[in-house]
């Protein structure tokens, strides 16, 4: 069964194995993929689908050193190298769009960029920087509604850029404590406006991003990654988490996304994502 072909949206996959996203930090020039990155993915084109390393839709989302972006012409050209190399080997590939939000350090970011998040509370722990080694995470600036609207549009533009580069679609990284999950998680999102204060408010940013990306490139080209009981980057479970994610999945289901990718952090000490929750998300 693993080796049987599968149709994902309108995309024919040669088998049912998916290469999960893995941050590699090899984009040393202007956060653009290079020939080495293209070779890496081409070597793995035997998977039915590759999901790339986390790729920022914005200069403000480049929290880690040397991760790729998808907002500049140079980056789009770099991803075209990757897409062409994978397709030449018969593979399919989605770009994972990851805005790091508060999981960041200013030393890793280009000039003019800033660390942002749902609130102004820094992520606990350290972030590696090339300039000074491990440093405490930078304190973010709390995003206002104009910032949120701009970021939603950046995700949509990055989706268009991915398709323009020849990639087959995008996965929205809504897991592991990055910006989308920072809004979803009640331990991090303590806002009292329309983007917090309730399950509906906390879900709002994720839904707006997904809607914008679907409008930009089509529902069959957009998936999302979620970690309902995540423990990574100071998130953690909270009261009502299962009910919130079922409601989120229902709204995402109305958009007809290509897939939902669920991450289980039980190996890190978090509660496992129950079979019941997975079934309810799948409905």
Region spans (language model):
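Flavin-dependent oxidoreductase catalytic cores
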Residues: 1-283
């Amino acid at each position: 069964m693993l080796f049987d072909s599968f149709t994902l949206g309108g995309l024919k996959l040669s088998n049912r194995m998916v290469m999960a996203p893995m941050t590699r930090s090899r984009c040393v020039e202007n956060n653009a993929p290079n020939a080495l990155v293209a070779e890496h993915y081409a070597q793995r084109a035997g998977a039915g689908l590759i999901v790339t390393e986390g790729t920022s839709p914005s200069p403000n989302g480049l929290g880690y050193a040397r991760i790729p972006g998808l907002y500049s012409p140079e980056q789009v050209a770099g991803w075209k190298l990757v897409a062409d190399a994978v397709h030449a080997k018969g593979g399919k590939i989605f770009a994972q769009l990851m805005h790091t939000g508060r999981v960041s350090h200013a030393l890793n970011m280009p000039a003019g960029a800033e660390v942002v998040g749902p609130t102004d509370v820094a992520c606990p722990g350290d972030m590696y920087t090339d300039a000074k080694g491990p440093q405490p995470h930078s304190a973010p600036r709390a995003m206002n509604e104009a910032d949120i609207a701009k970021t939603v549009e950046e995700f949509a533009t990055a989706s268009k850029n991915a398709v323009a580069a020849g990639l087959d679609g995008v996965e929205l990284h809504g897991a592991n404590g990055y910006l989308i999950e920072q809004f979803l998680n009640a331990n991090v999102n303590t806002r009292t406006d329309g983007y917090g204060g309730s399950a509906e408010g906390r879900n709002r940013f994720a839904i707006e991003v997904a809607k914008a990306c679907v409008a930009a490139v089509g529902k069959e080209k957009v998936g999302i990654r979620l970690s309902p009981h995540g423990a990574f980057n100071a998130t953690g479970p909270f009261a009502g988490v299962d009910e919130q994610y079922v409601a989120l999945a229902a709204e995402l289901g109305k958009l007809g996304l290509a897939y939902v990718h669920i991450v289980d952090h039980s190996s890190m000490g978090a509660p496992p994502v129950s079979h019941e929750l997975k079934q309810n998300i799948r409905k």
